[in-house]
Structure formats: C-alpha cells, structure tokens
C-alpha cells in the first residue's frame, strides 16, 4: 500500500517537533504584538489623547517606557507602556484627591501667577476628566483582526503538514 504525501507529512511533523512550529508561532506572535501597538498608536492619534510624543512613542517596541515581555519560548507576549498616566488617559481621572485645594499666587490681569509665598491665591475644585478609551477601542479592533489572522495562520500551517 502506498500513501501519497506520507513522506512530506513525516518531514513536516519532524520539523514541527524539532521546534520549527514553535519558532514560526513565536515569529507570528511578535508580528501580532507589533500590529497591536500600531493600532494603539492610531487610536491615540484619532482620539486626540496625546499632546506630547512620550506616550505615543512608548507604544513602540524597544522605545523608552515600552513594555515588551516575551516568555514561554516566545509563545507568550505582553505589550504595552510603563507610563503611569496612560491608564488615566484611557479610563479618566480626577484632577485632585481633595474636593477643593488652595493654590497660592496672584492674578496679573487675566493670568494667574503661582507664588508659594503669597497670602492670596485661588481655590481649585476637583473635576472629573473623562478618558478617551483609546486602549479599550484598540483592543476591540485588534481582537477582530487577531481572530482572522489566527484562523488564516492555522490554515497555512496545516497546509504545510
């Protein structure tokens, strides 16, 4: 009895067992991480969340404040930013922990000049700053893309067997 393609299947299975599949999966996962970071950056721009480049660039692999952790032989990837204020911009935040806070200083025309030694000043009320949801929206977009990408990649890997 002769089975067509058995030799190729055997070779492909040996390659997969020797770490070939793991290397391919690791490479694909890294590409997925890059894709997600690009979507986050697009969301930061489209929601007008940023006013400096620090947050935007922290979502680039290898950049200062970027989070890129590969584990389990490349089959686990954690991406993001190490900037504390990133979550405040996504979720929203209060301007202060206190309901009202005193800021010493004086007014010069319509401008307020901060002066820690001044006996005059102004009282600032606590205010809620709504978040833009840039991360949450990027995650929703990416989940849809990831599902299609995973399906396609699995079909591609299975065809090679």
Curated annotation (Swiss-Prot):
Entry's family note: To B.subtilis YqbI.
Name of protein: Phage-like element PBSX protein XkdI
Species: Bacillus subtilis (strain 168)
